[in-house]
Amino acid sequence: MENNAFKSGFVTLIGRPNVGKSTLMNCIIGQKIAITSNKPQTTRNRIQTVYTSEEGQIVFLDTPGIHKAKNKLGDYMVTVAEKTLSEVDVILWLVEPSNFIGAGERHIIEQLKKGKTPVILVINKIDTVKKEQLLEYIDTYRKEYDFSEIVPVSALKAENIKELLKCIMKYLPYGPAFYDEDTVTDQPVRQIVAELIREKTLRLLSDEIPHGVAVSIESMKYKKNI
């Protein structure tokens, strides 16, 4: 029987490079899909991950960070991220309380003001600051933009993630699931493996190679009990 109360929709994560977008996505779905690194612009492609519950299905689009591009690769990645803003039902803007609003944040605000999509401000890494500092940070952002919701979380420690998911569901339309309940990403296994290799390369050889490294897998063998 069809569930008329079921919700489904697309949600994009935006923010400065390295604020924890990929970490948040991995936390929500409970497994590692998007790679993380301390290098800017680790995420190059638009990755879809899927969260499904009894209430609905959320398809997350983890885009490259929005910033002012310094080269052709950066320009392409920013274009992909900004184009996504008009294609989704909800925008999650991920920030961290270590810095207040600067040129990068104002650039994102300019992009958000061009549309009418609900925007949820997600303040990540709340485990790294005191409550007084967090409240001051929230107040600063409230003065800059009329957010639909403001949700503090810690993606690393999985704090307040359930509350964030409830907030997202509020703004999704009613409709059927886009994927079956066992699907967690649209990425093929080969692509996920290639990204995991790239992550390790960026971490272990950060001084030897630029962050413009790419991985090409020629063959794969599946083994049990690894």
Predicted regions and their residues:
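Conserved nucleotide-binding/hydrolysis micro-motifs of P-loop NTPases
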Residues: P40-T42, P64-H67, P97-I101, I126-V129, ...
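Conserved G1/Walker A P-loop phosphate-binding module
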Residues: M1-V90, V95
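Conserved C-terminal guanine-recognition region of P-loop GTPase G domains, centered on the G4
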Residues: Y51-Q57, Y76-I150, K221-N225
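P-loop NTP-binding site
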Residues: V189-I226
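Amphipathic alpha-helical transducer elements in NTP-driven molecular machines
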Residues: Q41-R44, G74, V78, L85, ...
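Signal for well-folded cores of large energy- and translation-related assemblies
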Residues: G15, I29, I33, Q48, ...
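Flexible glycine-/small-residue-rich
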Residues: G15-R16, D62, I123, I217-K221
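Canonical P-loop GTPase G-domain recognition
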Residues: T117-P118, D127-V189
